[in-house]
Amino acid sequence: MPLNKDIKKVLVIGSGPIVIGQAAEFDYSGTQACEGLKEEGVEVVLINSNPATIMTDKKVADKVYLEPLTVEFVEKVIAKERPDSLLAGMGGQTGLNLAVELYDKGILKKYGVNVIGTSIESIKEGEDRELFRNVMSRINGPVIQSEIVTDMENGKAFANKIGYPIIVRPAYTLGGTGGGIAESEEELDEILALGLQLSSIGQVLLEKSVKGWKEIEYEVMRDSRGNCITVCNMENIDPVGIHTGDSIVVAPSQTLSDKEYQMLRSASINILNSIGIKGGCNVQFALNPNSFEYAVIEINPRVSRSSALASKATGYPIAKVASKIALGYTLDEIKNAVTQKTYACFEPSLDYVVVKIPKWPFDKFQGADRVLGTKMMATGEIMAIGSNFEAAFLKGTRSLEIGKYSLEHKKFRELSIEELKTRVISPDDERIFALAEMLRRDYRMDKVAEITGIDKFFIKKFRWIVEEEQRLRLSKIDDLDKEWLYKLKKKGFSDKGIADMLKVNPEDIYRLRNIWRINPVYKMVDTCGGEFEALSPYYYSTYDVYDEVEVSKNKKVIVIGSGPIRIGQGIEFDYASVHCVKALKKLGIETIIVNNNPETVSTDFDVSDKLYFEPLTEEDVLNIVEKEKPDGVILQFGGQTAIKLANFLKEKNISTLGTTADQIDMAEDREKFDELLEKLKIARPKGKGIWSVEDGLEEAKKLGFPVLVRPSYVLGGQGMEITHDEKELVYYLSNAFQKDKKNPILIDKYLMGREIEVDAISDGEDVLIPGIMEHLERAGVHSGDSITMYPTQNVSKDIKEKILEYTKKLALGIGIKGMINIQFIEFQGNLYVIEVNPRASRTVPYISKVSKVPIVDIATRVMLGEKLNDLGYGVGVYKEPELISVKVPVFSTQKLPRVEVCLGPEMKSTGEVLGVGKTLEEALYKGFIGANMSIKKEKGTVLATINDHDKEEFLPIAKKLHSLGYKFIATSKTAELLKEEGIEVKQVRKLKEESPNIIDTIKNDEVDLVVNTPTKGNDSKRDGFHIRRAAIERNLGVITSLDTLKAIVDIKFKEIKDETLYIFDLSN
């Protein structure tokens, strides 16, 4: 039992949906914490709204509440479960803010709940900018010259006093949200107003900019007795001025002198002791590169993105140790899980280099402002481990899946030196490639260091890589001798990177390596620099003499992970990978995971029998397969990242379990798939590939408008659009053919029907559908951005039977063994197939939890040859539950400047929440609250700008809103429509007309909700785009789908109140 015998039942608050600034790292740390508490015999109650997580599985906590993360719903859980304690620091900023609010409102006191781990007072001292500054003053800790402000007037006065640029940091926000660097009073007006609005306590810290100083982080653990260790220190390659979540980070720090290292280490420990932290804490410093001057930027008195990185970089399980400290244990009483010999009071030591590189969503949002600053924009990250910096960095670059295997980027070849300088002075996600091009042109290293703020140590490393690339470019393959190839491999060059420079095939380099026996060995991450034997096999590749992998002769399977979190491929795929591993382990099969994401549960050291922290490229995966010689490789759970390895593994005669490469190709190749549908007599929307604007117009005439147009070979709906007339179609096609003349544009009849989705399992003979899901929004909104309902609410028995029939025909026709995801449209009583994915999809965690069918477990067993009829869940459509569960998407577009907000065929959401209720309205109400949609407001003002073809449908919804007491503001045509129906409306000028116009209405806070149905997709020159962006940047609700608006209005009519709703424990 825990040292503190009074702790019997602990409430853990999760972090909710994945948004930019708060991603999968909290699933990893929350899962670890729950396990750590349960190991000590403590009952764990969890509240978290995110169904895509491992954390919300029924076996992770004793009681699992997938409910909105608001004070009202957390109080309901506390009232029902009566925990004696609350652990606040595992749910990111969301969990911390909730814990503080529960404390301030007296709810914790009312129910006798104690906060364990770091106290609320200590959390406030770490999070409240003014209290933190007072602590620093008390211990003589240097801080940057700053002022705490709560209004615009004082903010401007301070800025005028110390001069620009000024850094704006709101209190209690996430990932730098609402912050930024103001270079002028005009910029300060905009950033400060938003920062004050988004801070939960209306407080902002303004500080003098030390942009260009080094940014250093320490991850520190402290127990209740004051024992303190630094787990890991990390150096941001990018200087202060770029959010640490958007920075390239290296561990351990590479450029600090011993004096600097010890100085900052002592300062970190001093801060933790002064605040009284109990658990993990992240401390961020700014260090003057030209002196020993430093300042504390901020601390995070909780587990964080950096603590997940530090855990994976060192093998030290920070969240688990923090949970034990919260129970009263001291560091010298907690065993190191990796070595089982040392204790948690031993500081880890690293004999390797770790590099973290962020993954940005700009491939999805090509019009976005890519310049990096103090506001985080990355959706995820990769981690790479090497025996030297160059190896780790090059591994990291190819792990990003951006098609880069070197530091060369074609588009920078055309730029002048002045243009390249601009690209690194205003750094964006591609700055390293611009920097490399400058070095390629012999720009002086000290000058590059000066203008970028990147230490000369790193510039020298990049220079060496660039010089080797240049040397290869000027060579032939015959010039490549054994010694040179070994040196390149040791420094992280890939076969493809070398081959591209030599203009040969990667296979040629692979052949040479085999002739010369230049193959990687694998070293272990052991937390102690090899001083003690590690029991948890966690490996990285290097080109060295001694190999630390022991290859067994057991039956074994390699599971390929899904890589970094990104829009379209999120935490859902990590959930599936982890469940696959658990299923294999239950069957007594040795499990091996290959992945490169430091935020996830799959890369925890004790999930699989072996973990290889490696890039998910053909070469890196093949090296592991050749080392381990598994009985098979599973690709179905790693999203497109894993699936795209299928053909390569087939060419190498490597067995993939389940669906084969040819079968995957049948589902993904349009022509082959069309042939199959024809053969099976299954309908799909009519369409074809076209090669010119004229062809497109001709085809559209045959099909009839509206039509869905999209480029060939895209993922996540990228570049898709619905066009309603010839003018829109010509505009889309002209742009599309200008970008890509080599591939056809696909044009389909757009059916404005009901979209229905299934995740099914096939064993080659039978099919099991755990649940049929219905989308609230009509077809045309990407399935990942749609509200999903289960059980279906409007699907007839006949259509359900047809869905089962088509699913079985398709699964058996393709030859699926394992998972298949199918999307259907029901239109005018007919059923059409629109898409088939021969793998696990993003709805698997959701439907697994709400149907209570262990989908991944069953699919894994089927891949290994078992039959559905023997697995206890039958075949056909599984029985439907009584409760209704909705999955509501969550967006991060506010954090991405110049990004389109409206829903369409291209996916934009970063996360999701679950709403569970006895009725659809109750479930939707909870889902909307959990997704932070402003649904509780009784009345307000709606700004409506409605597209012509939506006006008729909008009218009855507008009448309902009017009857509820809402007022309207609208532009001319929409205003006329409302007036004709007797609805009072204030007419407002359009964007191009003189002030006050529609944008002024938004900026002057005259509006509570914006309803805008767009006319032309992603054209940022149009009024609608600017209206939506202005609203989202003022933190207003923006609705672009009338289906969503109708659902919200229906809920308001039901007058649902928090106090009347039930909460549901989904662990049973």
Curated annotation (Swiss-Prot):
Pathway stated in the Swiss-Prot or TrEMBL entry: Amino-acid biosynthesis; L-arginine biosynthesis; carbamoyl phosphate from bicarbonate: step 1/1; Pyrimidine metabolism; UMP biosynthesis via de novo pathway; (S)-dihydroorotate from bicarbonate: step 1/3
Molecular function terms from GO: ATP binding; carbamoyl-phosphate synthase (ammonia) activity; carbamoyl-phosphate synthase (glutamine-hydrolyzing) activity; metal ion binding
Record: residues binding Mn(2+) 1: Q284, E298
Residues the entry annotates as binding Mn(2+) 4: E835, N837
Binding site for Mg(2+) 1: Q284, E298
A GO BP entry: L-arginine biosynthetic process
Positions bound to ATP 1: R129, R169, G175, G176, K208, V210, E215, G241, I242, H243, Q284, E298
Binding sites annotated in the UniProt record for Mn(2+) 2: E298, N300
Domain MGS-like per the UniProt entry, residue ranges: 933-1068
Positions with a binding annotation for Mg(2+) 4: E835, N837
Region entry Oligomerization domain, spans: 402-549
Binding site residues for Mg(2+) 2: E298, N300
UniProt xrefs under PROSITE patterns: ATP_GRASP, CPSASE_1, CPSASE_2, MGS
Species whose genome carries this gene: Clostridium botulinum (strain Kyoto / Type A2)
Domain of life where this protein originates: Bacteria
Assembly information from the UniProt record: Composed of two chains; the small (or glutamine) chain promotes the hydrolysis of glutamine to ammonia, which is used by the large (or ammonia) chain to synthesize carbamoyl phosphate. Tetramer of heterodimers (alpha,beta)4.
Cofactors that this protein relies on: Mg(2+); Mn(2+)
Protein name, UniProt field: Carbamoyl phosphate synthase large chain
Keyword Chloroplast (UniProt): no
List of residues binding Mn(2+) 3: Q823, E835
EC number annotated for this UniProt entry: 6.3.4.16, 6.3.5.5
